[in-house]
Curated annotation (Swiss-Prot):
Residues 33-46 have a biased composition (Basic and acidic residues). SUPFAM superfamilies: FAD-dependent thiol oxidase. It catalyses: 2 R'C(R)SH + O2 = R'C(R)S-S(R)CR' + H2O2. The gene is Gfer. This is FAD-linked sulfhydryl oxidase ALR. It is an enzyme of class 1 (oxidoreductase). Its cofactor is FAD. Preferentially expressed in the liver and in testis. It comes from Mus musculus.
């Protein structure tokens, strides 16, 4: 019979992490993993121990791609034996870029004069979106920011400008340059004035 602290039926040193959708990820203390985080073989005396994992990465556990940026994840790998495919899960930076592109495009096509119901729905969408964003640290940061500065969904222009200011706050936190909010329609709706998007 297993000790109270050990899950019954699983070998010692092995735990399961249950993921959304019922999938599960096995965590072991003695597995050597390849560049994709898959268990390649059991660790032996000749296998060097791994370095401490950065925040969002735990030894013996597949990394949460949405929680960790690519550079941090790569630092935990001893060597990279395969190229990454385009159809693999996004890392934190990719997810962030695509999320902002989606949100800015959503704001660019929001109605010029939304009904009260549309205004309420969009504000609710932003709040719900921040609860389910896959990077928990990012989601918590956005929830705090929108708690201090509620979405302005009164018009398309107001919503686009509110979102641009929010994005610039996050950019400053990350040490990135601000985007000129006077150019949101050019960037996300109409295309650049020089015709390069035509």
């Amino acid at each position: 019979m297993a000790a109270p602290s050990e899950p019954a039926g699983f070998p010692r040193g092995s735990r399961f992490s249950f993921l959304p959708g019922g999938a599960r990820s096995e965590m072991t203390d003695d597995l050597v993993t390849d560049a994709r985080g898959r268990g390649a073989r059991h660790r032996d005396d000749t296998t060097p121990a791994a370095a401490p994992a950065p925040q969002g990465l735990e030894h013996g556990k597949r990394p949460c791609r949405a929680c960790v940026d690519f550079k941090s994840w790569m630092r935990t790998q001893q060597k990279r034996d395969i190229k990454f495919r385009e159809d693999c899960p996004q890392d934190r930076e990719e997810l962030g870029r695509h999320t902002w592109a989606f949100l800015h495009t959503l704001a660019a096509y929001y109605p010029d004069r939304p009904t009260p119901e549309q205004q309420q729905d969009m504000a609710q969408f932003i709040h719900i979106f921040s609860k389910f964003y896959p990077c928990e640290e990012c989601a918590e940061d956005i929830r705090k920011r929108i708690g201090r500065n509620q979405p302005d969904t009164s018009t398309r222009v107001s919503f686009s400008q509110w979102l641009c200011r929010l994005h610039n706050e996050v950019n400053r936190k990350l040490g990135k340059p601000d985007f000129d909010c006077s150019r949101v329609d050019e960037r996300w709706r109409d295309g650049w004035k020089d015709g390069s998007c035509d």
